[in-house]
Each structure stands twice: as C-alpha cells, then as structure tokens.
C-alpha cells in the first residue's frame, strides 16, 4: 500500500468512465485558428468572443505597462501592490459599467468564491439558479449559509421561494445568477430578477462573465442601467485578457476590500495584464459592428444546425450547446470535427448534467459566415455520414 494509491485509483476510475482530462499544447495561429500537433484548426470553442486576445493594441499596452511598472505587483494590493495602474483601469471600468465604483480581482473563479462568502453570514440565505457555474456553487458552499436552488431561468419559482422565506429570520437574502449561462448560452430575465430583488428586499448578484464585451450598451453587459447590487465579470473572455472585476457602489467596494479573502491574501495582477485590460476597455465600446456580426453568425448557425436535427437548447447568444446526449457521442463528434479541421471540445459530466453531453460551440467575431457554414456542413456530415 502506498499513501498515494488513492491518486491512481481516482485516475483509473476516470479512465474507465472516459472522463480523464488531459492537456494538449495549443499555439495561436492567424485569425480564429490554432495549431495543435502541427495541424491548423479553426477554433470554435474559445471564449475570445471579440477576437481581442492577439489585438496589437492589447499587446502593445501590455508591454508598455510592464516597462513602466515591472513584471509583477510584488504583493497584495493592501500591502504595496496597489500600483496606480489599478486606479486607472477601475475608474474606466466603473464609467463604462455605469456604477459608482469597480474593483479588479484576479480571476472569475476567485471572484465568485470570495464575493459570496463576503456578502453572507451564517444566518443568510442564497437563492441560486440551478444551472449556475461551478465557481458560484463553490462560493455558495464557502459562504456556509443556507442555499436554495431555483429552477433554471424561472422567475416565477424564484418569486415563490422569496415569498416562502420572507419571515424565516434570515439576516439577508441574496439572489445569484449568470446573465449569459456558460454551458447553455441562454440569458436570464434581468428585468424580472431585478424587480423581484427590489420587491422582496433581496440582494442581487449577477455574473456577467460571458456577457461582458458582447451584450448591453457598449458591450458592457446585460446589467448596465439595471438595479443590480453586485455585478461580477471577467476580462478573459470578451475582453481578450485575464482577470475579473466587481462593479458596485462605493460602499460595497470598500466592504469587499475589507472582507474578500481572495482579494486580501492574493498578490495583485501583473501590470502587463492591467495594460491589456486597459486597452480592451478602450476598444470594446466601439465594437458594435463586431458584436452584431458575432450574434448574427450565431443565429445563422442555430438555424443551420436545426435543419440537421441538432438540439441547441434555448441558446440566444454566441454560445451554442450542440447536445448529443451520451459522453461517447460527444467524444466521437469532437474527433470527427477535428478531422474536418475544427477544434470543438466535448463537454461532459460533471460540467453538464448526465445524458446532456455536448459540443459547446462558442463563436468569435473573427469567424466569417463561410467559416460558420463550413462548421454547419461538418456537423451535418456527422449526422448523415
């Protein structure tokens, strides 16, 4: 017996279930393409929704910030790592998000797992959408308070729960949802949720990770102009960079600076990352044409896939779940598409529910209509070999 026997046992269990995850080296190529093992593939599974990750301005400003402020922030922002470039980015972000204040955090996962525990005490109640991201689920667990799930995108069920819990003695109630759901590509009913939060004196926190850059006024998300207490989002998707943010009131920002363990005990983001974020925030507001192209191509692909009998759920965004059911079918389809020149990764449990394995297609503004049609044809060829 070895003290590490449990490691091999777990890996073997995953191999037997075809759920062993492995890493593949990827190199960016031109446009929306990547190179894997010498093969050029059109990438249809990245979150680089506006194609900004290799934009010259992001690269240039990352270099400029690194030259001015160095390679690293050297410490937590509460010690000596709060370089002046943070203020520059946060002030710009708050203006764009139409909130009094904003705070840069290190990653989307860190944000959700530190904001939720900060907002709640042991006597709180979190009302969470049933299909929320794993980072929200873990944030709820770390909050160590009561958690109730409401049916996915169902304001009526949420209202029922709010009524039922009104006089249960909770110190506060917090509703948490994604605005654009990462695995299903559908959007929450923001007006309904905001109305319920106001009517029932509940806090509302919205994860805008997959909406930032793509939806809303100037691409700043579906919460813009809405009465949402805590808006979390990321820079590693539509903005093409890395990191996360929370947009909120000035008082909440001060509260998070003092209460968010993930912020307090982490070294600040490197200046180069802040530079690329700063550049993205200059570019994104003026990219309405790219946003329209992206969403038009997604709508076109949904129609094309439907003609082949594929189920894309309730998707209404740049994310299209092509749901095929079994894990083996998703793996087979992924390999088939790679043979046709597309990188399209299979998404399987536990990332999605059992029997809902899928190819998660996520389009970019760099994809042309011809790219989308070729992808649709490849799906059709798998359906009708």
UniProtKB/Swiss-Prot annotation:
Catalytic class of the enzyme: transferase
Catalysed transformations (reactions): 6-carboxyhexanoyl-[ACP] + L-alanine + H(+) = (8S)-8-amino-7-oxononanoate + holo-[ACP] + CO2
Keyword field contains tRNA processing: no
E.C. code: 2.3.1.47
GO BP terms: biotin biosynthetic process
Superkingdom classification of source: Bacteria
Residue numbers bearing the N6-(pyridoxal phosphate)lysine modification: 237
Cofactor: pyridoxal 5'-phosphate
Pfam family, one: Aminotran_1_2
Residues reported in the UniProt entry to bind substrate: 21, 133, 351
Swiss-Prot/TrEMBL keywords: Biotin biosynthesis, Pyridoxal phosphate, Transferase
Coiled-coil portions: none
Pathway(s) annotated for this protein in UniProt: Cofactor biosynthesis; biotin biosynthesis
Binding site for pyridoxal 5'-phosphate: 108-109, 182, 207-210, 234-237
GO molecular function: 8-amino-7-oxononanoate synthase activity; pyridoxal phosphate binding
Function of the molecule: Catalyzes the decarboxylative condensation of pimeloyl-[acyl-carrier protein] and L-alanine to produce 8-amino-7-oxononanoate (AON), [acyl-carrier protein], and carbon dioxide.
Protein family membership: Belongs to the class-II pyridoxal-phosphate-dependent aminotransferase family. BioF subfamily.
Subunit comment: Homodimer.
Protein name per UniProt: Putative 8-amino-7-oxononanoate synthase
Lineage of producing organism: Bacteria, Pseudomonadati, Thermodesulfobacteriota, Desulfobacteria, Desulfobacterales
